[in-house]
Amino acid sequence: MLEKAKIDRINELSKKKKAGTLTADEKVEQEKLRKEYIKSFRTHMKGTIENTTIIDPKGNDVTPHKIKQMRKNKK
């Protein structure tokens, strides 16, 4: 995930934006940090989904076909 300092900076810039005191340079920085955060989040979420197996109460693997295909393509 993203470094704590960067997340703190995103939150700080968000508060400044709400207060109406965000400068143009800070707005550019905020957008860059948000994009970096979203990219990191999506990468980690994709990894979590790819490594999830769904088992029904009868013990059958009912993992969606799309996830199985993602695993197969990864190998």
Swiss-Prot record:
Q: Where is the composition biased (Basic residues)?
A: 65-75
Q: Where is this region: Disordered?
A: 55-75
InterPro entries from the UniProt entry: DUF896 (IPR009242)
Pfam families xrefs: DUF896 (PF05979)
Compartments in which it is found: Cytoplasm
Q: Which Gene3D superfamilies match?
A: Helix hairpin bin
Q: The organism sits in which domain of life?
A: Bacteria
Keywords in alphabetical order: Cytoplasm
Q: Which GO terms describe its cellular component?
A: cytoplasm
Report the principal subcellular site.
cytoplasm
Member of which family?
Answer: Belongs to the UPF0291 family.
Record-given protein name: UPF0291 protein lin1342
